[in-house]
Structures are given as structure tokens and as C-alpha cells.
């Protein structure tokens, strides 16, 4: 949903990070289907050893490590209009470095939109972190969604396979 909201009024690429390669590919496929475009055209992805995006792509999904690597040759991430860091609660080293980098980049790129998403993140803490230094706290936007029922099973409910007496 956030990706589609960002397409309006954009003047550059939307970069969306995912913590895992499979997630980046899967989400890219889904977004391309939702928009009605072939994967690799308007919506692309890049993971280690695989780049299915074009210069004309509007949305690029990638692992957080790929975006972090891009900062080495494009310090201001100039081709991006919006950066979405998804699953920020994963708190990997790459995500933590990326969030720190984006915080220091924002004063130099006030036009850059940064969106951090998570189902379980401490909203107030991140809002204060991205504000601070004389700036107001970053805005918090809550997007409600579907919740899925969770069934809890214990080992008692799972039948144990028959084991041979000797191996």
C-alpha cells in the first residue's frame, strides 16, 4: 500500500528494502502484478548477483545490503525520491547502519522521503530518533490491515511417529 501511495508526485526512484533476497523478489513480483506491468520494467529488483531493474524503473526492491552498497558510490542517493525500509524490526547490522546513514543524510537531502515500516517497532522511539537535533519528531502513520488468525499447537497435539526399537 505504501508503495502505491508514493508513486503520486514522485520525482525519482522509489527504493524499497527487504531483509532477505526471496522477499525482495516476491514483493517485486506482487507489486508488478498489482500495477499491471511486467517484472523488470516499471518495477524491478536487485539482490546479490541479480539485477532485474532498468534505469526507467519507478520502483526498485532490493535487500538492505544492496542499498547500503549504493551509498558507497552515491553518497546522497540522488536517484531516489523515496526510500522505504521494510521490516525494520529485524535489526540486522545492515538495517541499523542504513537507518543511521539515512538519519545523517536527511539534513542534506530534505527532499528525500524516508518511510520505515514494521509491525512491531517501537513507534515513539523511532519517531524521536528521526526527529531530534532541534527538529520535530518524525510523523507516525499507522496503516491498519488484516490480521490473520493464529493457531497454537503443542507437541501433545502432534502425533509422534512410530520409532523402531533398534537402528
Predicted stretch roles:
Residues 1-4, 8-159:
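P-loop NTPase motor module signature
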Residues 158-167:
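A short, hydrophobic C-terminal helix/tail in secreted or cell-surface proteins
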Amino acid at each position: 500500500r505504501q508503495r502505491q501511495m508514493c508513486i503520486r508526485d514522485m520525482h525519482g526512484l522509489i527504493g524499497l528494502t527487504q531483509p532477505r533476497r526471496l522477499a525482495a523478489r516476491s514483493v517485486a513480483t506482487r507489486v508488478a502484478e498489482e500495477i499491471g506491468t511486467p517484472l523488470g520494467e516499471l518495477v524491478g529488483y536487485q539482490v546479490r548477483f541479480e539485477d532485474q531493474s532498468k534505469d526507467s524503473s519507478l520502483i526498485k526492491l532490493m535487500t538492505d545490503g544492496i542499498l547500503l552498497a549504493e551509498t558507497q558510490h552515491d553518497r546522497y542517493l540522488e536517484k531516489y525520491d523515496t526510500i522505504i525500509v521494510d521490516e525494520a524490526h529485524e535489526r540486522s547490522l545492515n538495517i541499523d547502519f542504513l537507518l543511521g546513514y539515512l538519519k545523517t543524510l536527511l539534513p542534506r537531502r530534505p527532499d528525500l522521503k524516508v518511510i520505515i515500516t514494521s509491525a512491531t517497532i517501537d513507534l515513539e522511539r523511532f519517531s524521536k530518533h528521526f526527529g531530534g537535533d532541534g527538529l520535530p519528531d518524525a510523523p507516525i502513520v499507522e496503516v491498519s490491515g488484516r490480521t490473520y488468525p493464529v493457531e497454537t499447537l503443542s507437541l501433545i497435539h502432534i502425533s509422534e511417529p512410530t520409532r523402531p526399537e533398534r537402528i
